[in-house]
Regions:
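N-terminal intrinsically disordered, cationic/polar leader segments
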Residues: 1-32, 37-42, 47-49, 53-63, ...
Length: 128
């Protein structure tokens, strides 16, 4: 029997892969921010609903996205700005670990503020 969820998952994965293949670095970073903030909302729901297995999966995804954002930094060319962004990504990673261990949404909220501000700044770079 055909599982429609498998088809949708394959479509969604192909769609993201196709967007990533045709995107420039600016768009790729924006996609990472979008994915991060979407997944952060899921973590909030998982903690509120006490779905701790799903929370762990979402935290793992968030950590991978932070790794991707950090890997996109050019610390040599970016200088102090890139170093500051790296520090913020690492701070968010630590906050996510605390949120996961303590099931404390205040860590999620502070991470959301930081990442939303970074996303807005990155979006502003694209309009210049």
């Amino acid at each position: 029997m055909l599982d429609l969820n498998d088809g949708f998952s394959a479509y969604k994965s192909t769609s993201v892969d196709a967007k990533a293949a045709s995107a420039d670095i600016h768009k790729l970073v924006l996609m990472l921010f979008d994915g991060f903030l979407d997944e952060l909302e899921k973590v909030t729901g998982h903690i509120k609903q006490k779905r701790y297995d799903k929370k762990a999966e979402s935290i793992e995804k968030l950590m991978r996205i932070l790794g991707g954002l950090e890997a996109s930094l050019d610390l040599e060319k970016g200088g102090e700005v890139a170093q500051n962004m790296q520090n913020l990504y690492q701070h968010c990673g630590q906050a996510l670990l605390q949120a996961s261990m303590k099931n404390d949404l205040s860590y999620i909220d502070s991470t959301r503020v930081v990442m939303t501000n970074l996303q807005e700044g990155w979006q502003g770079l694209g309009t210049q």
